[in-house]
From Swiss-Prot:
Name used for this protein in its record: Aspartyl/glutamyl-tRNA(Asn/Gln) amidotransferase subunit B
Catalytic function, reaction form: L-glutamyl-tRNA(Gln) + L-glutamine + ATP + H2O = L-glutaminyl-tRNA(Gln) + L-glutamate + ADP + phosphate + H(+); L-aspartyl-tRNA(Asn) + L-glutamine + ATP + H2O = L-asparaginyl-tRNA(Asn) + L-glutamate + ADP + phosphate + 2 H(+)
Enzyme type, top EC level: ligase
GO biological process, alphabetically ordered: glutaminyl-tRNAGln biosynthesis via transamidation; translation
InterPro entries xrefs: Asn/Gln-tRNA_amidoTrfase_suB/E, Asn/Gln-tRNA_Trfase_suB/E_cat, Asn/Gln_amidotransferase, Asn/Gln_tRNA_amidoTrase-B-like, GatB, GatB_C_1, GatB_Yqey_C_2, Gln-tRNA_amidoTrfase_suB_CS
Function: Allows the formation of correctly charged Asn-tRNA(Asn) or Gln-tRNA(Gln) through the transamidation of misacylated Asp-tRNA(Asn) or Glu-tRNA(Gln) in organisms which lack either or both of asparaginyl-tRNA or glutaminyl-tRNA synthetases. The reaction takes place in the presence of glutamine and ATP through an activated phospho-Asp-tRNA(Asn) or phospho-Glu-tRNA(Gln).
GO molecular function annotations of the record: asparaginyl-tRNA synthase (glutamine-hydrolyzing) activity; ATP binding; glutaminyl-tRNA synthase (glutamine-hydrolyzing) activity
Family, per entry: Belongs to the GatB/GatE family. GatB subfamily.
EC number: 6.3.5.-
HAMAP family with a match to the protein in the record: GatB (MF_00121)
Pfam families membership: GatB_N, GatB_Yqey
Entry keywords, A to Z: ATP-binding, Ligase, Nucleotide-binding, Protein biosynthesis
């Protein structure tokens, strides 16, 4: 039987505010346990929450960016459940009237095509605390610094059909919230976490299968691995005559498996009711429109512009627009060199490899956009070859010079373009390889094509990579066939 996967994602984006959603406590990551939890966060008697207006602004800007309906009257509700790191016994969230209604987001698939993913809603809520197990020898410690941290929970429609599509969607959300400046997107610190709802059904069947929810997956790689494992688990279970039960599961990256945590709750299990301590939030049209004017050029808009303005492929445009910092870096390189394709190739190639190797974000790149643009200009005017350019790039990364020109001059790397000098070097190289020359001249066309590369390599070696490759090819062919 052929199976179809159905996936819906709930993404929790921690909003980049300095204080919590209902109190003035700080939200800084990494503070000593329980040093950023106020009486309000702890739910002490007599305390009352005060809504942080900046969280409302951030949520509305997100809603506008996904072309969603904005809830002009939205209500906070209490989500009731017991957990050790939830001191109040309830979480303040939104249920019936969220701040952001139906919207959508386009994602780029591996083949470059676009797919539209529906977004059911996005609502504001407070985070819970954190349970600590490692250092307490049979006990659990509770850190309430995170309690009350503002979250925007973004709920997708069940429009996703594979683990790769899920990753593409999460990456698109990740890029969007960073473009908007509402979340730093640091998944390692828990700023962006994902709950994956996964089910399978026979291909062609309309009704959904029973879903399992994988909680709190916090990396793109783990999202893909967790979903793929869960898909396989459910298919094998059904084909062996079993039934998938609705439950919450946890992904263990060390064992690459999901395991059951608890039965999956429904909304009525949480006994939602309007929070009596918070009035409904009423958003006027003018407030929403003023926020619309603050929206930057968004990732999909930038991708489309990169394709139309610079003639880039859909893939290149998607990679370069994935973060605002990379897009700005690329355009700064282009401003210097004027060649979009070369700029794109170097940013996505040598520069990205360097950043990955060093574990750096592009804003901390050791090679500035101006330096890279200057290097590309020296390739364009034939001052250096592409091979030498990589050596110069490495020198720039190692801070061996302020510019490509300075490094080229100091190391004597300027490309040899003098025809006489190249011919002299070729004559010496061919004389040193006389036997191979005779074999080449006696060979048929197919063998000659293979052997020609040997002579080019010897020529470039003899010139220490400085000879102009185009001239080498042209002159070498004349000499070998003359």
């Amino acid at each position: 039987m052929q199976w179809e996967t159905v996936i819906g994602l709930e993404i929790h984006a921690q909003l980049a505010t300095r204080s919590k959603i209902f109190s003035g406590s700080a939200t800084a990551f990494g503070a000593e346990p329980n040093t950023q939890a106020s009486l309000i966060d702890l739910g002490m008697p007599g305390t009352l929450p005060v809504l942080n207006e900046e969280t409302v602004r951030m949520a509305v800007r997100f809603g506008l960016a996904i072309e969603a309906e904005i809830g002009h009257t939205n209500v906070f509700a209490r989500k009731n459940y017991f957990y050790p790191d939830l001191p109040k016994g309830y979480q303040t969230s939104q249920m019936d009237k969220p701040i952001v209604g139906k919207g959508h987001l386009d994602i780029t698939l591996e083949d470059g095509t676009l797919k539209r993913i529906g977004i059911t809603r996005a609502h504001l809520e407070e985070d819970a605390g954190k349970s600590l197990h490692e250092d307490f020898h049979g006990m659990t410690g509770i850190d309430l610094n995170r309690a009350g941290t503002p979250l925007l929970e973004i709920v997708s429609e069940p429009d996703i059909r594979s683990a790769k599509e899920a990753v593409a969607y999460v990456k698109a959300i990740h890029a969007l919230v960073r473009y908007l400046g509402i979340c730093d997107g640091n998944m390692a610190e828990g700023s962006l976490r994902c709950d994956c709802n996964v089910s399978v059904r026979p291909r062609g069947q309309e009704a959904f299968g029973t879903r399992a929810e994988i909680k709190n997956v916090n990396s793109f790689r783990f999202i893909e691995k967790a979903i793929n494992h869960e898909i396989q688990r459910q298919i094998e279970l059904i084909e062996d005559g079993g039934k998938v039960i609705q439950e919450t599961r946890l992904y263990d990256p060390n064992k690459d498996e999901t395991r059951s945590m608890r039965g999956k709750e429904e909304a009525n299990d949480y006994r939602y009711f309007p929070c009596p301590d918070l009035l409904p939030v009423v958003l006027e049209d003018g407030f929403v429109e003023r926020l619309r004017e603050t929206l930057p050029e968004l990732p999909n808009q930038k991708r489309e512009r990169f394709q139309s303005q610079y003639g880039l492929s859909a893939y290149d445009a998607s990679v370069l627009s994935a973060s605002r910092e990379m897009a700005e870096y690329f355009e700064a390189v282009f401003e210097v060199c004027g060649d979009a394709k070369l700029a794109a190739n170097w940013v996505m190639g040598e520069l990205s490899s360097l950043l990955n190797k060093e574990g750096l974000e592009i804003e901390r790149s050791p090679v500035s956009a101006e330096q890279l643009g200057g290097l590309i200009r020296r390739i364009q005017d034939n001052t250096i070859s592409g091979k030498i350019a990589k050596m110069v790039f490495e020198a720039l990364a190692a801070d061996e010079g302020a510019s490509a020109d300075a490094i080229i001059e100091r190391k004597g790397l300027k490309q040899v373009t003098d025809t006489g000098a190249i011919e002299s070097m070729l004559d010496e190289m061919l004389a040193a390889n006389a036997a191979q020359v005779e074999q080449y001249r006696a060979a048929d066309e197919a063998k000659r094509a293979k052997m020609f590369g040997f002579f080019v390599g010897q020529a470039m070696k003899a010139s220490k990579g400085k000879a102009n490759p185009g001239q080498v090819n042209e002159l070498l062919k004349k000499k070998l066939e003359g």
